[in-house]
Amino acid sequence: MDLDVVNMFVIAGGTLALPILAFVASFLLWPSALIRIYYWYWRRTLGMQVRYVRHEDYQFCYSFRGRPGHKPSILMLHGFSAHKDMWLSMVKFLPKNLHLVCVDMPGHEGTTRSSLDDLSIDGQVKRIHQFVECLKLNKKPFHLVGTSMGGHVAGVYAAHYPSDVCSLSLVCPAGLQYSTDNKFVQRLKELQESAAVEKIPLIPTTPKEMSEMLQLCSYVRFKVPQQILQGLVDVRIPHNTFYRKLFLEIVSEKSRYSLHQNMDKIKVPTQIIWGKQDQVLDVSGADMLAKSIANSQVELLENCGHSVVMERPRKTAKLLVDFLASVHSTDNSKKLD
């Protein structure tokens, strides 16, 4: 989501080295432009480079740092209506000797948006596989990370293309079938039944709705200035028609439970990370996955909501690095036996 932007004042005012008047003018008059500058600045600071690659007439946009080496490359898949830059808060705490690749999911940010594109979970899995083959990322198995919708896609990808993936991190993934619905899912079903697609909580159209979405997705209660809320809305509004189409596709009967239907096919070592106070996707999904994936481990984070990467970037990065180290050392031991 957009939670990492809320700390931008300290960053922009203290380290961007922009004249104070220019900063104030941008804040008051063009908050959406300031948000774009924020992401540009952090990519540059963290050494993340943006590139494009094509599969036939389809363009993928991605950022990367480092080069493939003896450690597995890491491919990161963001959630619904986010973009590759949502990982920056976590990238900050990852070792610079890791090869990181963050891709814009189909239709998001710099990746092609086509009315003909299959936005179902299976369709997105196929697109990500095309991206992987374009970069030859699967020349040797890589580590796949996904959060929310991206976790849904990542889990199904690991089931469909097992030889591509050496290990998997699922961060509060969507795609599971619960015995009872939480309040958020109940509300979504009511909206679907009434055909009120304009009121989807994850697609805000006003600063007030943006504030409500941030509260829904985060355990921490940030006090976000009105101008920044407006900027976040301004950035998203041109894409809301696409977001609605995508949302209806991924909650359709074809896609809604794709991870649930494929989780027993996941054979690689799997890390499951979930915020205990997640109001979007119930934390009981972690136990559900652990019971179906033989080689898995669960990490539940206290005082953390759905936006795990934004709320607990340092902790999430440490869990990821520790998990990779344990899997990698185990693989090396097996080779020596």
Swiss-Prot record:
Q: Name one Pfam family in it.
A: Abhydrolase_1
Supply the EC number(s): 3.1.1.23
Stated role: Lipase that preferentially hydrolysis medium-chain saturated monoacylglycerols including 2-arachidonoylglycerol. Through 2-arachidonoylglycerol degradation may regulate endocannabinoid signaling pathways. Also has a lysophosphatidyl lipase activity with a preference for lysophosphatidylglycerol among other lysophospholipids. Also able to degrade bis(monoacylglycero)phosphate (BMP) and constitutes the major enzyme for BMP catabolism.
State the PANTHER family in the record: MONOACYLGLYCEROL LIPASE, MONOACYLGLYCEROL LIPASE ABHD6
Active site (catalytic residues): 148, 278, 306
Catalytic activity reads: Hydrolyzes glycerol monoesters of long-chain fatty acids; 1-octanoylglycerol + H2O = octanoate + glycerol + H(+); 1-decanoylglycerol + H2O = decanoate + glycerol + H(+); 1-dodecanoylglycerol + H2O = dodecanoate + glycerol + H(+)
Q: Which residues cross the membrane?
A: 20-42
Q: Which organism is it from?
A: Bos taurus (Bovine)
A GO molecular function annotation here is:
phospholipase activity
Report the protein name in the record: Monoacylglycerol lipase ABHD6
- What gene is this protein translated from? ABHD6
Supply the alphabetized keyword list.
Endosome, Hydrolase, Lipid metabolism, Lysosome, Membrane, Mitochondrion, Signal-anchor, Transmembrane, Transmembrane helix
Its localization reads: Late endosome membrane; Lysosome membrane; Mitochondrion membrane
GO cellular component assignments: AMPA glutamate receptor complex; GABA-ergic synapse; glutamatergic synapse; late endosome membrane; lysosomal membrane; membrane; mitochondrial membrane; postsynaptic membrane
Q: Give the GO terms filed under biological process for this record.
A: acylglycerol catabolic process; long-term synaptic depression; lysobisphosphatidic acid metabolic process; monoacylglycerol catabolic process; negative regulation of cell migration; negative regulation of cold-induced thermogenesis; phospholipid catabolic process; positive regulation of lipid biosynthetic process
